[in-house]
Curated annotation (Swiss-Prot):
Record's catalysed reaction(s): prephenate + S-adenosyl-L-methionine = carboxy-S-adenosyl-L-methionine + 3-phenylpyruvate + H2O
Source superkingdom: Bacteria
Stored InterPro entries: CmoA, Methyltransf_25, SAM-dependent_MTases_sf
Biological process (GO), any one: tRNA wobble uridine modification
Protein name: Carboxy-S-adenosyl-L-methionine synthase
Similarity comment: Belongs to the class I-like SAM-binding methyltransferase superfamily. Cx-SAM synthase family.
Oligomer status and interactors: Homodimer.
Gene this protein is translated from: cmoA
Role description: Catalyzes the conversion of S-adenosyl-L-methionine (SAM) to carboxy-S-adenosyl-L-methionine (Cx-SAM).
Annotated positions binding S-adenosyl-L-methionine: Y40, G65, C66, S67, D90, N91, D119, L120, N134, R201
Coiled-coil spans in chain: none
Molecular function via GO: carboxyl- or carbamoyltransferase activity; S-adenosyl-L-methionine binding
Keywords of this entry: S-adenosyl-L-methionine, Transferase
EC number in record: 2.1.3.-
Length: 244
């Protein structure tokens, strides 16, 4: 299955609308995410490794905000515990439809994967050993994030983990500027124009709300996790593991 090149913001837009995961984005998503998020491929592959370590026999693994299912496929390829399954959730019908097509191409279906089109805030989390929020929490209204993490913590087995990847913010203006400028340089190096960078930033401004690492660690502790550890960071993108 071929994927198109992202050119959604290549031409000047008459009217800027908030970013959404519609059919246009789905068609170019693999290209968009690889060219926009530094270290994305490494994050995906290592989520598979972490999931393999902490998946427990007879449990569920959740991929919340699964988009096209890259995390689910990475977990599926690594998990060896018996009677595990993966529940992948996204609220975009277009994402789920394309994700199911990609899932069907996987030639080694060792772990069952169920892709569900639903609001992840309304999906029951139960008997879980691994839960992944890979660049998902940042799209949840900040006031609702703690409640979601509390539900995840409650649904995890003892010894289970939450893997949380996010675009992050920095409290000091100098550090914020440092990381933002390098991220923009990364996107330019991957072929995005200044117009594309500017227009996408405007489209995401009210939709994607990043927070500091300290904020994430504090919220995870408040949700009941015993500890959280930063395992990956490249510029203003990071991933943490939180242990129950």
């Amino acid at each position: 299955m071929t994927h198109k090149t992202d050119a959604i913001y290549a031409a000047p837009l008459q009217k800027m609308i908030d970013f959404q995961f519609d059919e246009r984005v789905v068609a170019v998503f693999p290209d968009m995410i690889q060219r926009s998020v530094p270290g994305y491929g490494m994050i995906i592959s290592n989520i598979g490794i972490v999931a393999a370590k902490y998946a427990q026999a007879g449990s569920h693994c959740y991929d919340l905000g699964c988009s096209l299912g890259a995390v689910s496929l990475a977990m599926r390829q690594r998990i060896t515990q018996p009677d595990c399954d993966i529940i992948a959730v996204d609220n975009s019908p277009a994402m789920i439809a394309r994700g199911r097509e990609l899932l069907a191409l996987d030639t080694a279906p060792t772990v069952p994967v169920t892709m569900i089109c639903a609001d992840l805030q309304e999906v029951a989390i139960e008997n879980a050993s691994v839960v992944v929020l890979n660049f998902t929490l940042q799209f949840i209204p900040p006031a609702e994030r703690l409640a979601l993490l509390e539900r995840i913590h409650a649904g995890l087995r003892p010894g289970g983990v939450l893997i949380l990847s996010e675009k992050i913010a920095f409290g000091e203006p100098g550090r914020q500027q440092f990381h933002e400028e390098l991220h923009h340089d990364f996107k330019r190096a991957n072929g995005y124009s200044d117009l594309e960078i500017s227009q996408k930033r405007s489209a995401l401004e009210k939709v994607l709300i990043p927070e500091t690492l300290a904020c994430h660690h504090e919220r995870l502790q408040a949700a009941g996790f015993s500890f959280s550890e930063l395992w990956f960071q490249c510029f203003n993108f990071a991933s943490l593991v939180a242990m129950k």
